[in-house]
């Protein structure tokens, strides 16, 4: 019986290692179940052993009991993760010089110009999963773009007040199976298949401006008189919230406030804020703070338009890799956008202008792990350095980070 328990110990070690590498929820549940089974089995084996070795048990019962029950808990404690991580404070110094970095030069750029028969209006929300790009434009139309096949498919879901109709879709996200479209008026999430057919409607009972699909739920940024992070379960029930900023952004920024870092964790930053938080699966913790040497904006700057003309620099977008933090920020003039690159290994940052990469400017808005994306309409192509783009084309740019 006892040697069977050591086999279970070995299996538990494997599960612990998987949990440590991936923060896998299934591995956590399996670990807890297995730990319970091992403890019950050890008690049963002790009772059986006590019957056959009554003299030895009377002499060493305390030691054996502690040893047999302590082994699984020792494995657990030795492999447990420390959820408290030290926040990285990045000092950003204003500069008009060009950033020189081998890491930036190693970013790979892919560009696809795809013809569309249905003109796409300015983009309100987008997401990219593999070779599928999903776009919601300001006319409330939803498009699926198959990057490999260069095919554009428009959703046939009509707007209306019927139960299966969207009234006011304001943002979307996707995973490997579905597209999730949030209706702000109905406060519910429409779950669509990859061919844009309705599968399910999830009621949330709360309002948010943008969201991302993550493990076991949704990471959301809610805005009213303040900005709050919300975590919703897959069934739409909010189970966690945290205030990120007391400032209401009446002007939105180009950068997506919620990114998926290269480590697989979701990160969130309020609009016009310089602090990036990390969602570790249980709570939101401070991860990165950009310091422009001016302190936090005062309470008088309650709106984005006021902050933009206040002479205070602020962070616009951010991208997190294993070795670097790349961010863009608005200079004190309220117009000029520069970049800052922070090297995690040596703790050095440099800021300034960013040279084109393969003749394409870096202006990504969305990060998915190792890749960042931008979806560009023809009239915006020149901002990215793209030329000869047909007016009936929609352009998808993928930036692949080296590490």
Where do the protein language model's features map onto the residues?
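C-terminal motif of bacterial Sec signal peptides marking the signal peptidase cleavage site
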Residues: 75-77
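A short helix->beta-strand "capping" segment at the edge of beta-propeller domains
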Residues: 94-120
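Beta-strand-rich domains and repeat architectures in extracellular enzymes and scaffolds
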Residues: 111-139
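Short coil/turn segments at the loop-to-beta-strand junctions that recur within blades
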Residues: 118-120, 157-164, 203-209, 244-250, ...
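Repeated scaffold domains used in trafficking and secretory/extracellular systems
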Residues: 122-125, 166-171, 206-213, 250-258, ...
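Short beta-strand elements that form the blades of beta-propeller/WD-repeat-like
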Residues: 132-137, 177-183, 216-223, 261-270, ...
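Blade-loop segments of beta-propeller domains
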Residues: 151-176
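Conserved blade-ending motifs and adjacent loop-strand segments that build the rim/top face
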Residues: 289-308, 345-369
